[in-house]
Curated annotation (Swiss-Prot):
Gene Ontology CC terms: cytoplasm; cytoplasmic exosome (RNase complex); cytosol; euchromatin; exosome (RNase complex); nuclear exosome (RNase complex); nucleolar exosome (RNase complex); nucleolus
Protein name, as recorded: Exosome complex component RRP40
PANTHER family tied to this protein: EXOSOME COMPLEX COMPONENT RRP40 (PTHR21321:SF1), PNAS-3 RELATED (PTHR21321)
Organism, scientific name: Homo sapiens (Human)
Modification type N-acetylalanine: residues: 2
Subunit structure: Component of the RNA exosome core complex (Exo-9), composed of EXOSC1, EXOSC2, EXOSC3, EXOSC4, EXOSC5, EXOSC6, EXOSC7, EXOSC8 and EXOSC9; within the complex interacts with EXOSC5 and EXOSC9. The catalytically inactive RNA exosome core complex (Exo-9) associates with the catalytic subunit EXOSC10/RRP6. Exo-9 may associate with DIS3 to form the nucleolar exosome complex, or DIS3L to form the cytoplasmic exosome complex. Exo-9 is formed by a hexameric base ring consisting of the heterodimers EXOSC4-EXOSC9, EXOSC5-EXOSC8 and EXOSC6-EXOSC7, and a cap ring consisting of EXOSC1, EXOSC2 and EXOSC3.
Cross-link Glycyl lysine isopeptide (Lys-Gly) (interchain with G-Cter in SUMO2) residue location(s): 151
Transmembrane segments: none
Function of the molecule: Non-catalytic component of the RNA exosome complex which has 3'->5' exoribonuclease activity and participates in a multitude of cellular RNA processing and degradation events. In the nucleus, the RNA exosome complex is involved in proper maturation of stable RNA species such as rRNA, snRNA and snoRNA, in the elimination of RNA processing by-products and non-coding 'pervasive' transcripts, such as antisense RNA species and promoter-upstream transcripts (PROMPTs), and of mRNAs with processing defects, thereby limiting or excluding their export to the cytoplasm.
Length: 275
């Protein structure tokens, strides 16, 4: 009796699954199962066949699908773990399945290897700084992770300083680790942020929107006042203008632009330019 029950469970799971290409741009919920197109012989009979993602290299040797945030491989299945809109990016070479991910409006930041973030130094323990990055636990930062730092020439980092760096270790089983140098040992803009300026927090979705290559908001903001600005993938923005009033205006604009249309932004920028 166990065998018919397992077959019935598999058929029930397959009936609930939906083809990923039919729900692109739509809202998906945690627990949903997605079916990805398996590329066999494009010229052959039948064309592409919708079936659950298989991790067997021999069974699916010509398809390489990358799962981004919000998706998880579970055996030979692809499951949704976050609520949001399903997105897809075609591969640059034109072969393979591309990248699938879920675009969600989550507020809590989860450290990801390679992300550039803004942190706050909360403590110093021996040769390690503890940095608050907005995650579930603080990140560790070695004093040797700065450009030109040696045992004799230590960086001037104090508790309360703002740090702009990137993650080199970020997984669920280990403490996040940050550095302020790139692979060549150069700072490349990372390190201790200036004492002046204003630090504020926005949603993670707004950060991704502002860092998009085709985003016009930063170009419009740059035309108003001379400014310095730093974006952290953990939802933090540091901005500095010539005066405190200009700094506050820029911060308010960036916070409000998430819920404004393009025409509304143009009206606000035109009023500020006239004033």
């Amino acid at each position: 009796m166990a065998e018919p029950a397992s077959v019935a469970a598999e058929s029930l799971a397959g009936s609930r699954a939906r083809a990923a290409r039919t729900v692109l741009g739509q809202v998906v919920l945690p627990g949903e199962e997605l079916l990805l197109p398996e590329q066999e012989d494009a010229e052959g009979p039948g064309g592409a066949v919708e079936r659950p993602l298989s991790l067997n290299a021999r069974a699916c040797s010509r398809v390489r699908v990358v799962c981004g945030p919000g998706l998880r491989r579970c055996g030979d299945r692809l499951l949704v773990t976050k609520c949001g809109r399903l997105r897809h990016k075609e591969p640059g070479s034109g072969s393979g399945g591309g990248v699938y991910w879920v675009d969600s409006q989550q507020k809590r930041y989860v450290p990801v290897k390679g992300d550039h973030v803004i942190g706050i130094v909360t403590a110093k323990s021996g040769d390690i700084f503890k940095v608050d990055v907005g995650g579930s636990e603080p990140a560790s930062l070695s004093y040797l992770s700065f450009e030109g730092a040696t045992k004799r020439n230590r960086p001037n980092v104090q508790v309360g300083d703002l740090i702009y760096g990137q993650f080199v270790v970020a997984n669920k089983d280990m403490e996040p680790e940050m550095v302020c140098i790139d692979s060549c040992g150069r700072a490349n803009g990372m390190g201790v942020i200036g004492q002046d300026g204003l630090l504020f927090k926005v949603t993670l979705g707004l950060i991704r929107k502002l860092l998009a290559p085709d985003c016009e908001i930063i170009q419009e903001v740059g035309k108003l006042y001379p400014l310095e600005i730093v974006f952290g993938m953990n939802g933090r923005i540091w901005v500095k203008a010539k005066t405190i009033q200009q700094t506050l205006i820029l911060a308010n604009i960036l916070e409000a632009c998430e819920h404004m249309t393009s025409d509304q932004r143009k009206q606000i920028f035109s009023r500020l330019a006239e004033s």
